[in-house]
């Protein structure tokens, strides 16, 4: 098992999860974070840190592993992030919205740290 970041992170990107990860397995996109499933040690300390409940065990993945694939693919090309940055100023406007991945996801990498 590994943990994955899901749709709820898009445009919110709080990053509380980043600083508690003991193996630094988070990677940063412009408006979304992912977990590298090959680096995640399944400890679960990141899951309760997310205020929008975007982090789930891959056993709760929907759509035949959609989120596991997204996390694995983008962890290969986005920079590693180990220090919490500033979340987007407008994040509260998107916290309760659903279907954010299809509407707002950006493939552009973040800055990393």
From Swiss-Prot:
UniProt cross-references to Pfam families, sorted A to Z: DUF3470, Fer4, Fer4_4
Cofactor note: Binds 1 [4Fe-4S] cluster.
InterPro entries xref list: 4Fe4S_Fe-S-bd (IPR017896), 4Fe4S_Fe_S_CS (IPR017900), 7Fe_ferredoxin (IPR000813), Fd_C (IPR022569), FdxA (IPR054829), RnfB_subfamily (IPR050294)
Top-level lineage group: Bacteria
Key words, A-Z: 3Fe-4S, 4Fe-4S, Electron transport, Iron, Iron-sulfur, Metal-binding, Repeat, Transport
GO molecular function terms noted in the UniProt entry: 3 iron, 4 sulfur cluster binding; 4 iron, 4 sulfur cluster binding; electron transfer activity; metal ion binding
Keyword Iron: yes
UniProt-recorded name of the protein: Ferredoxin-1
Designated gene of the protein: fdxA
């Amino acid at each position: 098992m590994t943990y994955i970041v899901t749709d709820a992170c898009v445009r919110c990107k709080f990053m509380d999860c980043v600083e508690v990860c003991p193996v630094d397995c988070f990677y940063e996109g412009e408006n979304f974070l992912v977990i590298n499933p090959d680096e995640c040690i399944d400890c679960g300390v990141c899951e309760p840190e997310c205020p929008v409940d975007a982090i789930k065990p891959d056993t709760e993945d929907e759509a035949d592993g959609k989120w596991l694939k997204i996390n694995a693919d983008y962890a290969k090309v986005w920079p590693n992030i180990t220090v919490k940055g500033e979340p987007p100023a407008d994040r509260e406007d998107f916290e309760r919205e659903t279907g954010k991945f299809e509407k707002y996801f950006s493939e552009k990498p973040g800055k990393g740290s």
